[in-house]
Amino acid sequence: MKLALNTFVQIKIKNMTFQELQPKVTEITLNSKQSIDEKLLSICQLLSDSIDYYNWVGFYFANHESKTLHLGPYVGAETDHTVIPFGKGICGQVAISNENFVVPDVAAQDNYIACSFTVKSEIVVPLFVKGENIGQIDIDSHVLDPFTTEDEKFLEFVNEEIAKLY
């Protein structure tokens, strides 16, 4: 019976709506017992656990002097992409454009840095603090074209909550 209960809880969590996740994100950001990195990791874990097609969830942070992005907390498969030059790949392009970038099919994208053959799509949303792009949230999916404007709006909300930490 315990296994069935755990399975039910996992299914329930996986079916949470973005609206249901918003207060959970806010709760994490307000947790005074966690460092910023711990909060970011908790948010990555929440999103990975709650949304079926969020298979890799992580943050990159900008170093504007060296014009590079540096990997922050993440949940998912290990990546070799710990430093990304501005302009390179989807994340690097967002560092320059300051705009969301949704890639429905990474195989059709010219300037894409392959992380894994299992990644089919990606969404990257910049993180602004006082008008400056300090980084981004990056989501990889093993599903073709799963991201909608609702994902974009939700991830913008997540980044607005995170921006309050800085």
Q: Where are the language model's segments positioned?
A:
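Short, Lys/Arg-enriched N-terminal segments with co-localized hydrophobic residues
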Residues: L3-N15
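Juxtadomain coupling helices with adjacent low-complexity linkers
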Residues: Q22, T26-T29, S141-Y166
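Regulatory sensory and allosteric helical modules in signal-transduction proteins
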Residues: A62-T68, G72-A114
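Short loop/turn motifs at secondary-structure junctions and domain boundaries
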Residues: I51, A114-V119
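Sensory-domain boundary capping and coupling elements
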Residues: F128-S141
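A short, aliphatic-rich beta-strand micro-motif
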Residues: S121-F128
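Short hydrophobic/aromatic beta-strand element in the GNAT-like acyltransferase core
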Residues: W56, V124, Q136
